[in-house]
Amino acid sequence: MNIAPNTYPQVMKGKKILYVHGFASSGASGTVKGLRMLLPATQIVAPDLPVRPAEAIELLLRVCEGEKPDLIIGSSMGGMYAEQLHGYPRILLNPAFQIADTLLSNNKMGRQEFYNPRQDGQRDFLVNKQLISEFREVSGQCFAQVDSKERSLVWGLFGDQDPLVHTHDLFASHYPQAVWFHGEHFMNDRVLLRAVLPVIRWIDNAQEHREPPIIYIALDDTLSDNKNGWRKWTGEELQAYEGRLHDLPGFFERLEPMASAVKAFYTLAEHYDVRVVSAYPPSNPQALAEKQRWVEQWLGVPAYGRLLFTNSKQLLYGDYLISAAQTAYLAADDDANFMGTWLHFGEDPYKTWDDVMEFFSRLGGQ
């Protein structure tokens, strides 16, 4: 794992994260190295886990008692273990709650080599029927202490292209914060930056009672390129919906982003509480679902739970609004009722997203 030069010394500053590694891995994994580079002011505790699951849980409970981590992150098998470390904020990455079945279905019986070096020098281990039985017993203890407090503490992140573990629905039946990200089973730089780090930042802000300034960004004509949406359709389809193109099924979902919009969104989300706001055409109720899918596809984890629908700008209470001056289904006189700073996207001096980012670069996160 080769993290870009981005580092975030203010995120989880002076705090402690316990990382619980996955099957056949160790505390020297690339994910651990990536976290340490991203969060240089944070102590990352990453013990090598015993192969026997009961021993692994016992070790983790001792580590929690001694280290008292501010956050626990568990990946795959480690996510299954981390779910059982109650009382701590936790992020479970592709958690292998059914690890016994996962090992069997992926031909993991027999001698297995560790992917990363371990402090004890052990290079391999044996997966036999006894170990499978032990995994089944320990994983069966997951979700045993789910209550309202636990539901607020635990996040689940699930790769939408994970070929190994498929536990999103199982997790979501117990915890509400189940989030898809674009990726596979194993972590890489992009997933750490765009999926894991945003959740770490939310948890850190909540712990510090930190409330960043709020930016509302309009979806239509600001993030998504509505004006050129017709280019995705045939002449016959366009003719059938002439004068009401926004009612065309799939219109909003197939829109392209504005140039540099996605990059700008991720950058702003590092410093602000960014919300996506969208109007909806009353004649096309399915547009809400289409816009939700667009946000999930293009903006991902940082936009989770941050999509708002309204046809009246005066209902928005925040610090900044980035929106085209004229957006379908939003009355022009609503604009004057926004109490914060309104950046008229598409007009001087904010004709492009590069212009918008120049404005915010001068503010330093204020």
Task: Annotate each PLM feature.
Residues V11-G66:
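Active-site catalytic motif of lipid deacylating hydrolases and related acyltransferases
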Residues P89-D204:
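The alpha/beta-hydrolase serine catalytic core
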Residues A178-I214, D334-Q366:
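Charged phosphate-binding loop/patch that engages nucleotide di/tri-phosphates or the phosphate backbone
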Residues H209-E253, K351:
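Active-site neighborhood of HAD-like aspartate-dependent phosphohydrolases
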Residues E242-V274, Q286:
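Short, acidic loop-to-helix structural element flanking the phosphoryl-transfer center
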